[in-house]
């Protein structure tokens, strides 16, 4: 029986998060509250109380490294801790996810326990959303996203390429994200903000606008704009997609 539920709209998808293990909202990015919405969900995520996770959260969720593995019934969310441990599941239709967690409103023995639970919980939400996005002709993208005159512009680049620095030069009302955005094809390609900033204090936006262009920031090239060849552009986008 779910004791807590809330609905959001992320990347143009309706997301329902429910929990029978206490309120998970303090473990989500603070900006998530700006994405609250109503409507029938495209994706439902459930967190339930799990005795194995509660026995030793630090050992169960450390280190915060996760992968997805295909199963007959869908996908497994795996934590890598010397050996692979299944932490959650995602349906084959990628419209439902379930993960066991300790009691979320309980007392933590040390602060690190809460921190690792938070990283696993957010990692699972991102994995579920990425799976649903892929099923809906979309993907997350490590990029800064800007809205100008009703159009969206994404700026990808390797670490320290300048995505966050560039984002600081735009008013908050024009910013979709300084690190993680989403692209999805509906009637046309759309650029969406997500609740995850690049760092503490980073800025995000909950809107979505038509995608006009993607720029690859590269400090090794002379200043200016150069059109990329399709193969090179696809390679750069693949590098900047979550893995």
Task: Describe each PLM feature range.
Residues 166:
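Hydrophobic positions on the alpha1 helix immediately C-terminal to the Walker A/P-loop
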Residues 1-159, 169-176, 181-243:
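A noncatalytic interaction/capping subdomain that flanks phosphate/NTP-handling catalytic cores
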Residues 161-163:
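Conserved glycine(s) of the Walker
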């Amino acid at each position: 029986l779910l004791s807590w539920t809330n609905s959001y709209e992320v990347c143009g998808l309706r997301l329902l998060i429910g929990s029978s293990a206490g309120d998970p909202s303090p473990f989500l990015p603070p900006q998530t509250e700006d994405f609250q919405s109503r409507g029938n969900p495209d994706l439902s995520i459930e967190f339930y109380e799990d005795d194995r996770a509660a026995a030793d959260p630090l050992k169960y969720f450390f280190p915060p490294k996760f992968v997805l593995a295909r199963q007959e019934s869908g996908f497994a969310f795996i934590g890598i801790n010397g050996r692979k441990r299944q932490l959650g599941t995602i349906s084959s239709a990628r419209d439902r996810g379930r993960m066991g967690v300790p009691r979320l409103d309980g007392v933590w023995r040390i602060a690190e326990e809460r921190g690792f639970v938070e990283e696993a919980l957010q990692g699972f939400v991102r994995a579920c959303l990425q799976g649903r996005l892929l099923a809906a002709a979309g993907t997350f993208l490590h990029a800064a996203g800007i809205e100008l005159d009703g159009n969206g512009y994404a700026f990808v680049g390797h670490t320290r390429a300048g995505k966050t620095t560039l984002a600081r030069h735009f008013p908050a009302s024009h910013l979709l994200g300084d690190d993680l955005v989403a692209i999805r094809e509906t009637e046309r390609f759309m650029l969406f903000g997500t609740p995850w900033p690049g760092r503490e204090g980073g800025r995000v936006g909950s809107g979505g606008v038509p995608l006009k262009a993607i720029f690859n920031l590269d400090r090794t090239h002379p200043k200016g704009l150069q059109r990329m060849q399709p193969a090179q552009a696809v390679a750069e986008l693949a590098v900047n997609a979550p893995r």
